[in-house]
Every structure is written in C-alpha cells, then in structure tokens.
Amino acid sequence: MLTRRIIPCLDVKAGRVVKGISFLNHRDAGDPVQLAAFYNESGADELVFYDITASSDERNIMVEVVENVARQVFIPLTVGGGIRTVDDMYRMLRAGADKVSINTAAVLNPQLIEDGAKRFGSQCIVLSMDARRINEPGQPSQWNVFTHTGRDPRPTGLDAIEWAKRVVDLGAGELVINSMDADGTGAGYDNELLSAISQQVGVPVIASGGAGKPEHLLAALHEGKADAVLAASIFHFGTYTVEAVKEYLANQGIPMRRTPRPV
C-alpha cells in the first residue's frame, strides 16, 4: 500500500507566511524559509506554498522565496498563486519548485492544464480547487467551484466533481480539494466532497481546509479516501508536530513514511 503524505501548507503574503479563517483575518506565522527548513527536518513529506496576494508586484518576492526554500529543503515543493501562463510555470520550476499549482487560471483557460502537462509532464501539474456546498439541507450534496477566493469569491457555476474529472482528462497529475466551508475552522475536512471526487478520478487527491486535530486527518484519509492531507494552522502555531501526527496515523494503521531518528 502506498504511504500517505502529510503536507504543511504555507500561504505567503509579502514574503511572510500567514494563516487566516475562510481566507480572511490573517495571522503572521513566520518566515517561509525558516518554516520550510523546520518542516523538512520534522518529517513533512512535501511542502505547498501559495502566493495569496498573487499580484505582479509580489511575483519577484515569491520567486526569491522559492529559490531560498529550494536550497534548504530536500522534499518535493509545490508552488501556486498567480500562475497564469506556461512561462509562469517555467519560472517557478526553474526557481526550484517540483510542481506548480493552478486554480483560477485553469478555470479561465483550461487549455493551460494541457499545455503545462505537455511541456513539463502531468506529474508537475497540480489543480487546486476551492469548492463550496450549494445544496439546501435535505437535498443531494452538491458543490460548486469558486475562483478569486478571499474577499471577493466568485462562483463559476462549475460542478466540483465534473470539473475534477475534466481537469484530469486535460492532464492534471494531482488535485488539491479545498473546502471553502471548512477552511481555517479547525472543524475537519469535507470528507463527503473528498470521497465523491476520489472515486471519480485516477490521480492522487489531496485534502485541504479544516484540519484541527489528528483525528481530522485520519478521517480524510479513511472516509474521504484522500491520498494526502494538507494542513496549516495545526502545524504553524505549534498545536501539533508533523512527527506526532504521523505517529498517531501510523498507530491507526495508515502507512506513513517515517523519519529516521539521529543516532
């Protein structure tokens, strides 16, 4: 059985790692290079960086962050936020990223997924999706995709499950499924959404949005059928360590990559 992955998520704003609730009310969580090095030593399986401002004036800061992080860590690094063209992908990969994550740009231009996969390989292309429940209580579950998440989230009218299937057909090699309803709440992932998508696609699905305790990660891997779990606040602010979470999951029968202890 393949090992499951624990992936700290670092949202970067103006060169600092921040974390908010439902994309707002950000708290400073530290220096991205220092945090990345810490997680590398702590047994994280991968790291994800999102440039949450994603404006042109921040782009050079993010490239510099990626370059500095790539010198410090020896685990896969995914970078997203403001990647709108194949040239943007190339710039981040050249800076040291192993994968690039696209979200809004893929909705606006789905061809970007196919173009990126053809040039760099599907293993480099991660599709990140922000989804929100739209069904009324008592009705069948349904989720729609949103873009420009933050202060001005915009509904796309795209069904989350159908969008997931389409982007995989276009060449996305992994999916990050973020629940807008759960993001930053610490109340657990939307496992129904994760399971619905996991059963429809043949690529790894990464759970995002809602981690508050190790039991939530376990539920995402079991009930949500996720291949990996993304988490931020529980790690950034010292609530739990990566090592402690991996030990808990391993004790629950989840196959994990264990970090060798120094002799």
UniProtKB/Swiss-Prot annotation:
Pfam families (UniProt xref): His_biosynth
EC number: 4.3.2.10
Family affiliation: Belongs to the HisA/HisF family.
Protein name as catalogued: Imidazole glycerol phosphate synthase subunit HisF
Gene3D superfamilies: Aldolase class I (3.20.20.70)
Pathway the protein contributes to: Amino-acid biosynthesis; L-histidine biosynthesis; L-histidine from 5-phospho-alpha-D-ribose 1-diphosphate: step 5/9
The keyword Cytoplasm is assigned to this record: yes
Known partners and oligomeric status: Heterodimer of HisH and HisF.
Role description: IGPS catalyzes the conversion of PRFAR and glutamine to IGP, AICAR and glutamate. The HisF subunit catalyzes the cyclization activity that produces IGP and AICAR from PRFAR using the ammonia provided by the HisH subunit.
Catalytic residues as annotated in Swiss-Prot or TrEMBL: 11, 130
One CC-aspect GO term: cytoplasm
One Gene Ontology term of the molecular function aspect: imidazoleglycerol-phosphate synthase activity
Chief location bin: cytoplasm
CDD domains listed in its UniProt record: HisF (cd04731)
Catalytic activity as recorded in UniProt: 5-[(5-phospho-1-deoxy-D-ribulos-1-ylimino)methylamino]-1-(5-phospho-beta-D-ribosyl)imidazole-4-carboxamide + L-glutamine = D-erythro-1-(imidazol-4-yl)glycerol 3-phosphate + 5-amino-1-(5-phospho-beta-D-ribosyl)imidazole-4-carboxamide + L-glutamate + H(+)
Keywords, sorted A to Z: Amino-acid biosynthesis, Cytoplasm, Histidine biosynthesis, Lyase
SUPFAM superfamilies given in the database record: Ribulose-phoshate binding barrel
EC primary class: lyase
Lineage of the organism: Bacteria, Bacillati, Chloroflexota, Chloroflexia, Herpetosiphonales
InterPro entries on file: Aldolase_TIM, His_biosynth, HisF, IGPS_HisA/HisF, RibuloseP-bd_barrel
Subcellular location as annotated: Cytoplasm
GO biological process: L-histidine biosynthetic process
